[in-house]
């Protein structure tokens, strides 16, 4: 980050898949650097996760059987409650399968899937599971599919740990003797591994 003309900052969190053990945690690239707000721990700051929750949305939809692995979406412009979402490149591919919709990060397919799941249901489930450390969680509605649910990178890391842990929620472990608590699965192992 030092090579950029404009002051920028960066943060990184690396955790082991099975144990959640944190192997690297850097919340800022320069604590003393005021020009880049170095004293802010960006791993604890809420940010838009962009499209990173799409796998969770599709997994929940697979679990609830509102879509299937061979699902085909109609990737086209839509209007939802006066809102006209679009894909990031403003292009549409017509009929597209689930795998390609996820790989291409298609917003229309994710929003339509979240409509089928019910964003209220998924937000409530997510809140119960991942928001135990305090801090409010705003309602994102269908914008949850495109980054509207603000999370810390730590919360996002725990979301991906859960998916890597066959759907069972896992906490980041900042101590080497940390053991995962026994919890029931958030999503099924089959959906987590699809």
Predicted regions and their residues:
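Secondary-structure transition/capping motifs at alpha-helix termini
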Residues: 17, 32-33, 62-71, 133-136, ...
